[in-house]
Amino acid sequence: MKKRFVLFVVTSLLIGLASTSFAAPVVDPVKVGLSKDLIYFVFPDRYLNGDTSNDSFPGYNPRDTAFFHGGDLKGLTGTCSDGDNGLARIKKLGFTAVWVTPLVVQQKPTPNGAGYHGYWGVDFLNVDPHLGTKADMVAFAACAKKLNLKLILDIVTNHTGDVISYNDKTAFLSSDLLNAKNPAWLNDLSNYHNVGSMSNCWGDGPCIQTGDFFGLDDIATEKPVVYNGWADVYGQWIKDYGISGFRVDTARHVDDAFFKNWSPQINAAAKSVGIDNFTIFGEVWDVNPINLMNYVRRNKIQTVLDFPFQRTAAEFAAGYSDATVVENLFAYD
C-alpha cells in the first residue's frame, strides 16, 4: 500500500493527497513536502473580524451566507502570541500548516452574492480589500513564520471571475470592464476560450477544458502567455510571503499540458527563496482512483486530493458501509 498524504481539516473528514501508483512502478517517487503536516483549512472571511474598517466595501452582509461576513487577515493572524486566538491558537491545537482559500481581489458583488470564498478573482496581484491589505498579508506571513506554521495558498488558474459577456455567441467586454482584471494579459479576450457554459459536458468532451465553469471566464491555459503569466503571478506570491504549497482549484479543467509547463517555473520560484519540496496539489473532482492516477501521471500534477478515500471514509463513518469497503479501497489503491 502506498504512503498517503492525509490532510486534517476543520471542515471535513480526512482527505488524502495521493500520488497514485497502481500496476506500473514509479521510478522516481514524488516528494510531497507537506506529507507529515497537520493542515488547518480555513476561509478567512468566516474566521474572525479583526478589522471592522474594511466592512464598508460592497458585498458585506453578515446576515446572508452568500456575501462577505467580515472575517479578515487581521482576525486570522491574531496577536501571534496569545494561544487563544488566531494563528497562535491554531498552532496550540497541534496544526503545523494553514491552508487558506484564495486571497485575491474578487469581481464586483451581484445581487445574488459575492466572492467571499475567493474563487471569482479579477486582480491576482493584490489582496481583496474585504480581507485586508498587502501589509496585513505581510504580517500574517510573518506571524506564521514566527510560529513555524507553513502557509498553503488556494489558487485558481482555470478561470477568472465572470466579466466577459456574450452577444449571439460572440464574446465582448462592456466599456466599464475593459481593464477590470490584473495583470493586463487577463483583459485580452484572445486568451480565453469564449465558448460559453460547460454545463452540458460534465463527462467527456472538449468543453470540459474550454467551457465556462459555472459561468466563470475560462482561460486558454494551453497558451504560453497564460501559463507563463500564471507562473509570474503565483511565483511572486511565493517570493513575497514564503508560501509552502498551492492547492490548485478546478485542476481537471485546465489544458492537459498546463502543469508540465507551469509547475517547473513555480518550483524554481520557490527554490529561489529557499523553499524546497514545494507542494502542488490539484483538485480533481473524481471518485475513481484510476482517473486520478491519469492526472498525476499524464498531466504531471504533483499530487491530487484523494476524493475516493473521502467518499469511502465518509460512508463508513456514517454507517452506510462496513470496514471491508475501506479495506478494499486500500487494497485496490
Report each predicted region and the residues it spans.
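Bacterial N-terminal signal peptides
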Residues: V9-A18
